[in-house]
Regions:
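Glycine-rich, low-complexity intrinsically disordered segments
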Residues: 1-106, 110-151
Length: 151
């Protein structure tokens, strides 16, 4: 099996200092604010050029406090949305316990100050490593016909 390595491009400074205080989805806490600080060479203003025209971002991050052990495999998880008692397949959930500890959140871009992104509506723990950022594209990212009977 192939192994890949990712560069951490920055870190989140968040209002959430403990993982148990974080909302389950970012849209549940629109007032929750944070800031993304970039590491070199991504702290160059050229890396964020054009974001001033964007209202929302996709944040790819690492669940750094739920890193799986080398030989750990979780095929089923207990999502809080189902009361924490019913198990479903890991790929049918948004559990932090994943084969690879990668997370994805959509956040509101409130502004850019001194090369840092001011973000709101977050569900990210303070100190969360960021591996990528992409602009939210409404016509491609919002799927009105999507169905999820679990959520």
């Amino acid at each position: 099996m192939a192994t890949y390595h990712f560069k951490v491009i920055g870190i989140v400074h968040s209002c959430f200092k403990e993982k148990f205080a974080i909302p389950r989805q970012p849209a549940l806490a629109p007032a929750a604010k944070g800031e993304i600080e970039f590491y070199p060479p991504y702290n160059d203003p050229l890396a964020i050029e054009g974001l001033e025209n964007v209202s929302h971002l996709w944040i790819n991050f690492i669940f750094h406090q739920t890193m799986p052990k080398e030989d750990e495999v979780r095929l089923r998880v207990r999502p809080p949305r189902l009361g924490g008692n019913k198990k479903i397949g890991v790929f049918a959930s948004r559990s932090t316990h994943r084969p690879n500890p990668l997370g994805l959140s959509v956040v509101k871009l409130d502004g850019i100050k001194d090369g840092r992104l001011q973000i709101a509506g977050i569900d990210l723990l303070d100190g969360t490593p960021i591996v990528d950022i992409k602009p939210y594209v409404p016509y491609a990212d919002a799927l009105p016909d999507a169905i999820n009977a679990i959520a």
